[in-house]
From Swiss-Prot:
GO molecular function: apyrase activity; ATP binding; nucleoside diphosphate phosphatase activity
Major location category of this protein: membrane
GO biological process assignments: nucleoside diphosphate catabolic process
A Pfam family that the UniProt record links to this protein: GDA1_CD39
Keyword Lipid biosynthesis: no
Stretches assigned to the Cytoplasmic side: 1-28
PANTHER family found in the cross-reference section: ADENOSINE/GUANOSINE DIPHOSPHATASE, GUANOSINE-DIPHOSPHATASE
GO cellular component labels: membrane
Residues given in the record as ATP binding sites: 89-99, 235-245
Known cofactor(s): Ca(2+)
Membrane topology type: Single-pass type II membrane protein
CDD domains referenced in this protein's UniProt entry, alphabetically: ASKHA_NBD_AtAPY1-like
Name used for this protein in its record: Probable apyrase 1
Length: 489
């Protein structure tokens, strides 16, 4: 049993009767010492900027990964998750015309709408290469497109918005001196007349492998395939006016089999790190085998007047490509599908003896070995346009499933017609293209089947636009370029 002294009992009785306010006052020194650091820490935490849910984090391979969005490969930089909006302006200076693409990205490089569309897209003809003798006029031809781009970008963001001009096969075909004169005129225009941020190296002739790689990234980005195994990606064939590109992902084993290339030529395989996945991308650009350039190759390849089997009856004239002019008149007996196809095969050099590899496409070029990355093909640009004009694809559809044999069947129908009947049957074909419609369709079928080895009855996807976030985006290489420049800005 505990004993309490009288003094202790008195003290306890005194403490029990003490008011709370008196206690706080008596222990105020202790409270200040304890609570001051707590309050200071809380204040610091309150004032610190909060990272959004989509902030970037470090990926397993040292890649900066957007935690809630898409990501770009090794060139991705910090700060993309800050919720800021950024724009990129990309000019596609092709052989058949000039096009401007304006993209708007959020902090994770996901596309944001521009007005009612997911991008601004405008185009005009002719292309820069049509002004080979007047570089200043070539540059001026871009002014109206530049003005369209400026209209949709807020004034306060224009100075920090990068503008790139990528010239493709048409300008490459002019040679170094003439193409550089045009490019310099464009650089001067952007420096003097544009409110966008430009750098001299951003106005350039794209090499074919860059163009093909950007196109592959664009389509697989929009389809949501990046980050998946290479076998889940799609291959891309892009038929421009001056060149055609083939790009598809291959296995690391096949990448190791890539043959060496001559000095100055692009390597067959590019290694890309995208969404934490390494891809070995086979890509090759075939200069002079775009649709408009191939006409010249076919006209040259004909022995004697063989080429006339590709021209519609009733056409008398010449074909100009670059600085070259070719006779291009039809026979009184009309075109012949089978004879035209023989000329197209010869123009492609399918049996080129220079093939020193196990598998080649045409012209002695290694084909990448094939494989899963090529099984699902997306085929773009002039393939879609001619299919729509020939009537076996809805011209208003963003994409369509077809077979190479559809081009063959359309070619057989067209080659039987004369110019007048073809104009009446295919009203969507421009007057200057009608005489070449038989040739174009024969070439496209021959390119797919004999050139790239696609089965005539394999399903392929003709693509003009790709569905993305309840909208449709142009299936063109500029988006891949825009992602790169936006992520490295």
């Amino acid at each position: 049993m505990r004993r309490f002294s009288a003094a202790a009992g008195a003290r306890q009785q005194q403490q029990q009767g003490e008011a709370v306010s008196d206690r706080v006052l008596r222990f105020r020194g202790v409270l200040v010492v304890v609570l001051a650091p707590v309050l200071l820490i809380s204040l610091v935490l309150l004032l610190m900027p909060r990272a959004p849910a989509s902030a970037t984090v470090e990926g397993s391979a040292g890649e900066l990964v957007a935690a809630a969005g898409r990501r770009w490969g090794p060139r991705a930089v910090s700060g993309l998750g800050d919720g800021s909006t950024r724009y990129a302006v990309i000019f596609d200076a092709g052989s058949s015309g000039s096009r401007v693409h304006v993209y708007c990205f959020d902090g994770n490089l996901d596309l944001l709408p521009i007005g009612k569309e997911i991008e601004l897209f405008k185009q005009k003809k002719p292309g820069l290469s049509a002004y080979a003798m007047d570089p200043q006029e070539a540059a001026k031809s871009l002014v109206s497109l530049l003005e369209e781009a400026e209209k949709v970008i807020p004034v306060e963001l224009r100075e920090q918005t990068p503008v790139r001009v990528g010239a493709t096969a048409g300008l490459r075909a002019l040679g170094t001196e003439k193409s550089e004169e045009i490019l310099q005129a464009v650089r001067d225009l952007l420096q003097d007349k544009s409110s966008f941020r430009s750098q001299p190296e951003w106005v350039t002739v794209l090499d074919g492998s860059q163009e093909g790689a950007f196109q592959w990234v664009t389509i697989n980005y929009l389809l949501g395939n990046l980050g998946k195994p290479y076998s889940h990606t799609v291959g891309v064939v892009d038929l421009g006016g001056g060149s055609v590109q083939m790009a598809y992902a291959i296995s690391e084993k096949d990448a190791g089999k890539a043959p060496p290339v001559a000095e100055g030529e692009d390597s067959y395989v590019k290694e890309l790190l995208l969404k934490g996945t390494t891809y070995y991308l086979y890509v090759h650009s075939y200069l002079r085998y775009g649709l408009l350039a191939a006409r010249a190759e076919i006209l040259k390849a004909g022995e004697g007047n063989d080429y006339r089997n590709c021209m519609l009856e009733g056409h008398h004239g010449q074909y100009r490509y670059g600085d070259d002019i070719f006779e291009a008149s039809g026979l009184s007996s009309g075109a012949s599908y089978s004879k035209c196809r023989a000329v197209a095969v010869r123009a492609l050099k399918v049996d080129e003896p220079a093939c020193t590899h196990m598998k080649c496409t045409f012209g002695g070029v290694w084909n990448g070995g094939g494989g899963d990355g090529q099984k699902n093909l997306f085929v773009a640009s002039f393939f879609f346009d001619r299919a729509a004009e020939a009537g076996f694809v809805n011209p208003k559809a963003p994409f369509a499933k077809v077979k190479p044999s559809d081009f063959e069947e359309a070619a057989r129908r067209v080659c039987k017609l004369n110019v007048k009947d073809a104009q009446a049957t295919y009203p969507d074909v421009s007057e200057e293209n009608v005489p070449y419609l038989c040739m174009d369709l024969v070439y496209q079928y021959t390119l797919l089947v004999d050139g790239f080895g696609v089965d005539p009855y394999q399903d392929i996807t003709l693509v003009k636009k790709v569905p993305y976030s309840n909208s449709f985006v142009e299936a063109a290489w500029p988006l891949g370029s825009a992602i790169e420049v936006a992520s490295s800005s």
